[in-house]
Amino acid sequence: MEFLERTYLVNDQATKMYAFPLDRELRQKPVNKDQCPGDRPEHPEAGGIYHCHNSAKATGNRSSKQAHAKWRLCAASAICFIFMVAEVVGGHVAGSLAILTDAAHLLIDLTSFLLSLFSLWLSSRPPSKRLTFGWYRAEILGALLSVLCIWVVTGVLLYLACERLLYPDYQIQAGIMITVSGCAVAANIVLTMILHQRNFGYNHKDVQANASVRAAFVHALGDVFQSISVLISALIIYFKPDYKIADPVCTFIFSILVLASTVMILKDFSILLMEGVPKGLSYNSVKEIILAVDGVISVHSLHIWSLTVNQVILSVHVATAASQDSQSVRTGIAQALSSFDLHSLTIQIESAADQDPSCLLCEDPQD
């Protein structure tokens, strides 16, 4: 019969940390063979203990989301490559700068999709002694690089559009342009459908979108705008050949919309890199949940942040009465917070008699 060996940290009244193995408790209760290591027992006994890190449910959710993200990115890459080649050929034949620049946008998208796939693989690597949290943030860095690619290619489009406004000496085959741009719109709509994810946040008991797929979705959404601009300009030029200026004008307008679409994703990722509270979680609500646990007198040094989207970490200092069993309090807090599927939970138990009301580090953060 196999037994799990676990080690827990409990803070004594002098706030010194001691580590001790809980061999006695583990000998009393064998491990369920059908239960994943680190998962919480279905029916913990009174005073029972379960592992402090993420549950098997959270681990399974992470693996499932990674698999879905990889499938979506692979499918998007294949579609993107096919229609990129089609637009290069069609744009060259039609003599349309808008189609060629849209093909260039697809090339950047393809590069970003492959970069996102690489970052997903990198984020699945195990932690090292130097990178103790692992490579999860590689997913965010890859997504930010993807946004940077959007800015670069959109800047090029704006420059070329301005150049055509100043020097309108060019010819366009509007018929071919309509056919190619129409197919591009359809292809990009398919891309957005593949990459679209639901994003309700924790209050709706749903998960937030994968960072890499979310950035890829913004790319595809930008491609839809760009392709629509090409199609609109093609229709205008087809019916009114003298209005070929519509080609650079539409490119200019929808390039601005593409830039605007990246602002929100950049804001969310910046907050994540600044160790902000994850979107959908409320600091005050989490604190109230902890205070509601039997034996908890006060809560301070509560920190909530994310390694990456859906990888939430929480650490907290909890003051209890000297007569209170620290292990039962820790277990109660972990059970109360289990609905959040935390990646890692650290609880430091302290004596209420040792609290210092004048300590600035123990004060609640500002609103």
Swiss-Prot record:
- Tissues in which the protein is found: Expressed in endocrine pancreatic islet alpha and beta cells. Not detected in the brain.
Q: What does the entry list as the binding residues for Zn(2+) 4?
A: H343
Q: Where is this motif: HCH Motif?
A: 51-53
Q: Which residues form a coiled coil?
A: none
Q: Which InterPro entries match?
A: Cation_efflux, Cation_efflux_CTD_sf, Cation_efflux_TMD_sf, CDF/SLC30A
Please list the residues that bind Zn(2+) 1: H105, D109, H219, D223
Mind listing the GO molecular function terms for this protein? metal ion binding; protein homodimerization activity; zinc ion transmembrane transporter activity; zinc:proton antiporter activity
Q: Name one GO cellular component term.
A: secretory granule membrane
- Bilayer topology term: Multi-pass membrane protein
| Entry-linked Pfam families | Cation_efflux
Write the signal peptide boundaries.
none
Per UniProt, Zn(2+) 3 binds at H51, H53, C359, C362
The answer to whether UniProt assigns keyword Cytoplasm to this entry is no
- What parts of the sequence cross the membrane? 79-99, 103-123, 140-160, 175-195, 217-237, 245-265
Catalytic reaction equation(s): Zn(2+)(in) + 2 H(+)(out) = Zn(2+)(out) + 2 H(+)(in)
Cellular location(s):
Cytoplasmic vesicle, Secretory vesicle membrane; Cell membrane
Disruption of the gene: reported phenotype: Knockout mice lacking Slc30a8 do not display overt developmental, morphological or behavioral phenotypes. However, a significant difference in plasma insulin concentration is observed.
Report any one BP term from Gene Ontology: zinc ion import across plasma membrane
Residue spans, topological domain Lumenal, vesicle: 100-102, 161-174, 238-244
| Topological domains, Cytoplasmic | 1-78, 124-139, 196-216, 266-367
* List of residues binding Zn(2+) 2: C52, H300, H317, E350
- Keyword Metal-binding set for record: yes
Q: Which family does it belong to?
A: Belongs to the cation diffusion facilitator (CDF) transporter (TC 2.A.4) family. SLC30A subfamily.
- Report the PANTHER family cross-referenced here: CATION EFFLUX PROTEIN/ ZINC TRANSPORTER, PROTON-COUPLED ZINC ANTIPORTER SLC30A8
**What more is known?**
Each subunit of the homodimer independently transports zinc ions in a pH-dependent manner. The cytosolic pH promotes binding of zinc ions to the transporter binding site. Upon change into the organelle-facing conformation, the two histidines of the zinc-binding site get protonated at lumenal lower pH, triggering zinc release into the organelle. The transporter then moves back to the cytosolic-facing conformation where the two histidines get deprotonated at higher pH, resulting in a net antiport of 2 protons.
Name of the featured protein: Proton-coupled zinc antiporter SLC30A8
Species of the source:
Mus musculus (Mouse)
Q: What is the lineage of its organism?
A: Eukaryota, Metazoa, Chordata, Craniata, Vertebrata
